[in-house]
């Protein structure tokens, strides 16, 4: 999994040298943001399920057909609604991992790779998840550097879905 730390070390190792000043700056930058990233991850751990449920309800309001259409990809049944919350929660959980490592590696490895094919095969609309993630970003209640860390990875996921 790629993180700013592993990338700096890999680059130095590839050259067969110690970390350069630029690589050390990247490492120090991560450590300077680490507290905010860990606080963001804690907020996801404490609130992620609640955020996922609220985001799912937002999706149902924005796209009412998702609760009216029949089929496994829709939320017209309790099972369908549970799947929707589960999928949103998966995005949020993976975003929390990004906050911990300080990079997009978890999203790249666990979500982005094959995302378009996966959604297409299951008949899932990326717009549902974009709306859910935008809702979380706009309503999570985080502030300052903590919000900045969380929003960096929420926006990355939104862009990957777009």
From Swiss-Prot:
(15Z)-phycoviolobilin binds at residue 84. InterPro entries: Globin-like_sf (IPR009050), Phycobilisome_asu/bsu (IPR012128), Phycobilisome_asu/bsu_sf (IPR038719). The keyword Electron transport applies. One of its GO terms (biological process) is photosynthesis. Keywords: Antenna complex, Bile pigment, Chromophore, Electron transport, Membrane, Photosynthesis, Phycobilisome, Thylakoid, Transport. GO terms for cellular component: phycobilisome; plasma membrane-derived thylakoid membrane. Contains one covalently linked bilin chromophore. CDD domains: PC-PEC_alpha. It is a peripheral membrane protein. SUPFAM superfamilies: Globin-like. It comes from the Bacteria. It holds the Pfam family Phycobilisome. Its main location: membrane. It is found in: Cellular thylakoid membrane. Belongs to the phycobiliprotein family. Light-harvesting photosynthetic bile pigment-protein from the phycobiliprotein complex. PANTHER family: C-PHYCOCYANIN ALPHA SUBUNIT, PHYCOBILISOME 32.1 KDA LINKER POLYPEPTIDE, PHYCOCYANIN-ASSOCIATED, ROD 2-RELATED. Heterodimer of an alpha and a beta chain. This is Phycoerythrocyanin alpha chain.
């Amino acid at each position: 999994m790629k993180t700013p730390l592993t990338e700096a070390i890999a680059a130095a190792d590839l050259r067969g040298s110690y970390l350069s000043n630029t690589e050390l700056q990247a490492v120090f930058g991560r450590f300077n943001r680490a507290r905010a990233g860990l606080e963001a991850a804690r907020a996801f751990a404490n609130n992620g399920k609640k955020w996922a449920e609220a985001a799912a309800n937002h999706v149902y309001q924005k796209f009412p057909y998702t609760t009216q259409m029949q089929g496994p990809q829709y939320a017209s049944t309790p099972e369908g609604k549970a799947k929707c919350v589960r999928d949103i929660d998966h995005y949020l959980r993976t975003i929390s991992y990004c906050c911990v490592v300080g990079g997009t590696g978890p999203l790249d490895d666990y979500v982005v790779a094959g995302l378009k094919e996966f959604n297409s095969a299951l008949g899932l609309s990326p717009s549902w998840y974009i709306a859910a993630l935008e809702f979380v970003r706009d309503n999570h209640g985080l502030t300052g550097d903590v919000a900045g860390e969380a929003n960096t990875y929420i926006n990355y996921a939104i862009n990957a879905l777009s």
